[in-house]
Amino acid sequence: MKTVRFNKQALAILAACFIFLLCVVCYFSASSESHNAVVVGERARGHIAVRDVENRHLAEEKHAVIHAKTVGKIERVVSQEKVEILRPARVESKPPGEKTSTEPEETGVGKAPIQTSEGLEKLIGKIHYENKDEENDLRRQKVKEMMIHAWEGYKNYSWGANELRPMSKKPNSQNIFGGSQMPATIVDAADTLFIMDLKDKYKEARDYIENNFSMAKSTSTLSVFETTIRFLGGLLSLYALTQESFYIEKAREVGEALLPAFNTPSGIPKSNLDVASKHASNYGWANGGQSILSEIGSLHLEFLYLSRISNAPIFEKKVKKVRDALEKAEKPNGLYSNYINPDTGKFTGSHMSLGALGDSFYEYLIKSYVQSNYTDTQAKNMYWDVSDAIQKHMIKVSKQSNLTYTVELNNGQAQHKMGHLACFVPGMFALQAINEDTEEEKLRIMTLAEELAKTCHESYIRSETHIGPEMFYFNERDEATSKHSENGYIQRPEVIEGWFYLWRLTGKTMYRDWVWDAVQAIEKYCRVDSGFTGLQNVYNPKAGREDVMQSFFLAEFLKYAYLTFADESLISLDKWVFNTEAHPVPVLTN
């Protein structure tokens, strides 16, 4: 019996020991799992800095790879030891609503409609950065401060009107907008506010558009082109950025209001439209009442995207008919005249220009090819054909400084002048360069783009203000200057736009520096208490100001400047296409 009692006690002791050891094991096991979870969390936050390109499929971490867009940058990133550099996920960082000491405002703001900072950055790219670049951070914040200044001036003195007269502190109305209460600045600037993460100010714009914007407020004749690129383009971009469905409704309202302008025998729209009466007309000065190439050729991005998001094929059909007519029309030397008859679909006159009257048509050909995810072969073929003709007939080199520039043609005769508007061409050729098939052509076209960008830069630095004129000439007394006529500045963005593309597509910091110089010049010579003005004469700042703050100053100039100093993933050129008013719409992937 004693033996039995002893065995029972021993078993009890052993059982107790076993339970104790089991608890100890569980405790340390839990601690180990917790530690492992921390380690995994550290990996997820990006502490692994590199990854073998050949074994990338084995990695589970969802880091953002630094994506270089030019051939040279891609080679530099991938070719060294077959390693990609990884950018850590932004897990520990502050949410977009919080500001560092260098960021102007915003306080007490609500969430953007995109719901979360993670969702926002997934959609449009990095808003905040873990790899700090102090110089360009400060530049970017300065541009943001300029945007705030411009917006506050408009809000205080012209809210709900087209634009602001910043010196007079009164609303400005142009007849292109269809009446004084079409809020061009609000719709044009809203996506810039969103991209800059200015939540309070974006919400002001958003709420106004949702509750007040209506084409029924168009009480006079409007420009079909300007309404498309500013209002329709702005609304489409806002939908693409935020995914808020009311923007589709507003955009469709604009698109439907514009349809009567297309009711011509050829399908080519007229320039002007009275929305109430549905009466369309052309300008009398346009070669006797013809339609204008830059206007009819710069509707495709917007109408195509509107059809896709609204499931309304009518809009795409309208611009496809325009494209077909342009492709069919006879073109001397492969070049497009600035004027076309909307009844016959035939070009009239022989004035060709990459500046006013022609410009954005060419831009939209290559951008339509990109927007289609490189499937729109009609746009591709039309663009490459006319690009060859432009290079043959409309590109010249100056005798004095060997500056490459574009000319206008009139009856086959070259006019040796280049407009500020034509300085979008470097960006256009840069897009062409990265889509060329051979390395030789990539280099040749990119070199052309850079030479043209240099000429546009010369037009800026040869003025006293370091701001370029409306038009600059190449002759015995002028070279990239315009000291005798057309020497004002009305806040045009094309020069900045071209440098933005070249920064993104070549990675050369020189273009960032050029943009920054222009930003500083605008700040110095154009800023007033309630916004920004133009200049009467860029060679003589004492000559006076242009008392208008254009809606495109907020939509284009400040947006392109901001993006030049931002992370390259923010509105990536791989995923987005800018319309000619700098409103981004997505590349269509299905």
From Swiss-Prot:
UniProt-annotated catalytic positions: 470
A GO BP annotation: carbohydrate metabolic process
UniProt-listed InterPro entries: 6hp_glycosidase-like_sf, Glyco_hydro_47, Glycosyl_Hydrolase_47, Seven-hairpin_glycosidases
Principal cellular location given in the protein's record: membrane
Binding site for Ca(2+): 580
UniProt keywords, alphabetically: Calcium, Disulfide bond, Glycoprotein, Glycosidase, Hydrolase, Membrane, Metal-binding, Signal-anchor, Transmembrane, Transmembrane helix
Source organism superkingdom: Eukaryota
Sugar-modified residues: 156, 212, 373, 402
A single cellular component GO annotation: Golgi membrane
Disulfide bond found in the keyword field: yes
Membrane topology, record value: Single-pass type II membrane protein
Region spans: Disordered: 88-112
Pfam families the UniProt entry points to: Glyco_hydro_47 (PF01532)
Enzyme class: hydrolase
Positions with biased composition (Basic and acidic residues): 88-102
Residue spans crossing the bilayer: 10-30
Keyword Translocase set for record: no
Pathway info: Protein modification; protein glycosylation
EC number: 3.2.1.113
Disulfide bonds: 423-456
Function: Involved in the maturation of Asn-linked oligosaccharides. Progressively trim alpha-1,2-linked mannose residues from Man(9)GlcNAc(2) to produce Man(5)GlcNAc(2).
Name this polypeptide is given: Mannosyl-oligosaccharide 1,2-alpha-mannosidase mans-2
Organism: Caenorhabditis elegans
Organism lineage string: Eukaryota, Metazoa, Ecdysozoa, Nematoda, Chromadorea
Gene that this polypeptide is encoded by: mans-2
